[in-house]
A protein has these predicted regions:
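Generic alpha-helical segment signature
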Residues: 17-20, 113, 165, 188
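Residues at the beta-strand->loop junction immediately N-terminal to the Walker
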Residues: 59-62
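Extreme N-terminal, non-catalytic leader segments
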Residues: 1-55
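Nucleotide-state-sensitive switch-loop elements of NTP-binding domains
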Residues: 31-53, 64, 69, 73-175
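Short hinge/gating elements
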Residues: 13, 123-125, 199
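Conserved Switch II/interswitch segment of TRAFAC-class P-loop GTPases
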Residues: 155-159, 168-185, 192-199
């Protein structure tokens, strides 16, 4: 167990090469661990601003089918675009407050992510206190800077008053189940005011 406790990134890459999944993974890990240099962060943000890749945010209650929907969207994008579209998926799962652990299980539901044009990265919320990881804004910038055509961000399950994904994405999507309770409950769901799509 002691041997498992090590820093996977001793030093962040000095730059991010477009199309290099390993570089992107290392940069995101460095961002997550807080060991990314200020110069690289600045370069990522500047590069991301020159890219036109849209960012789709998929959010909703736990168990509503966010991962299954994300997988289906990726499958259809791949088929529709004849595998030309480069897609990055950034998926967030909740950390358990008592143990600090997280089951990064979004990928269990995803079958269409295997291919050389699809990058998938799991995150834990850690101590962010929200449905997103603290490093997510910078990770989105890194994915855009890496030259992807589409970035899909999936949050962990949310409650009625949560909408942290909205300022980070271009197109927010809310996924819900038909068992939401009385009709008056719909008036309490903050994401319904912001979502461009409801599934």
């Amino acid at each position: 167990l002691a041997r498992c406790d090590f820093n996977p990134v001793e030093q962040a890459p000095a730059e991010l090469k477009q199309g290099d999944f390993r570089d992107l993974a290392q940069v995101i890990t460095a961002l997550e661990l807080g060991v990314c240099s200020a110069a690289l962060k600045k370069a990522l943000l500047e590069k991301a601003q020159t890219q036109k890749a849209p960012v789709l945010g998929v959010t909703g209650t736990g168990g509503s089918g966010k991962s299954s929907l994300t997988d289906e969207l990726v499958r259809r994008f791949r088929l529709d675009q004849d595998e030309r579209l480069k897609i990055a998926i950034l998926a967030v799962d909740p950390s358990r407050r008592k143990t600090g652990g997280a089951l990064l299980g979004d990928r269990i539901r995803m079958n269409a992510i295997h291919g050389d044009k699809v990058f998938m990265r799991s995150f834990a919320t850690r101590a962010s206190g929200a449905e997103i990881a603290a490093c997510l804004p910078e990770a989105i910038a890194a994915a855009r800077a890496a030259g992807f055509d589409l970035v899909i961000v999936e949050t962990s399950g949310i409650g009625q008053g949560d909408a942290a994904i909205v300022p980070l994405v271009d197109v927010p999507m809310y996924v819900m189940t038909p068992e939401f309770g009385a009709a008056s409950q719909l008036e309490k769901i903050d994401m319904l005011d912001f979502a461009d799509f409801v599934a």
